[in-house]
């Protein structure tokens, strides 16, 4: 299974991705995590790109690098992956839900897609701080924390203000994809 390390302003979080049970969702996450130099030179259909929601620019860099954990709810989850940091941004496309019977929100450390309804997945994701079974069948689990759950918990304990926004900026500074 593929692992990805999110190097955050609070420390490293390594997640194991469920390539075999959520292949489309994992592929999307990896595409947004990686930098595709070919897309920088020529953003063609065969390159990995996303559209900046603020400028409309087609980009090939990692959407996640520099993105904030923009929503933190104590004992529930930490959410990131929005290039605008507002909770309303995404990669310029949406894709269908990908649920698997044995992948549920049955504990802390589950990596899942954030969405605004059925089949509206894009770039936003969250990591659970506790079991959240009410999210099963609504948000697709596609990985889990392998190392750095203490960092997830530290981010989850960050004081928040209006709209569950952290008072201190919590960033994904860089991303490392550990291919098999």
Predicted ranges, named:
Residues 1-180:
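Cyclophilin-like peptidyl-prolyl cis-trans isomerases
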């Amino acid at each position: 299974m593929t692992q990805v390390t999110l190097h955050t302003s609070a420390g490293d979080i390594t997640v194991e991705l469920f390539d075999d049970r959520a292949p489309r969702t994992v592929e999307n996450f990896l595409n947004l995590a990686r930098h595709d130099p070919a897309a920088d030179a020529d953003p063609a259909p065969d390159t990995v790109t996303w559209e900046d929601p603020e400028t409309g620019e087609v980009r090939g860099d990692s959407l996640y690098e520099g993105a904030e954990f923009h929503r933190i709810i104590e004992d529930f989850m930490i959410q990131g992956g929005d290039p605008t940091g507002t909770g309303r941004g995404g990669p310029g496309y949406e894709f269908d839900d990908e649920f698997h019977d044995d992948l549920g929100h049955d504990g802390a450390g589950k990596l899942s897609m954030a969405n605004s309804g059925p089949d509206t997945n894009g770039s936003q994701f969250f990591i659970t701080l506790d079991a959240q079974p009410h999210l099963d069948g609504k948000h697709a689990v596609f990985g889990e924390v392998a190392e750095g759950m203490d960092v997830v918990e530290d981010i989850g304990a960050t004081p928040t203000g209006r709209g569950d926004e952290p008072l201190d900026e919590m960033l994904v500074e860089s991303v490392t994809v550990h291919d098999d």
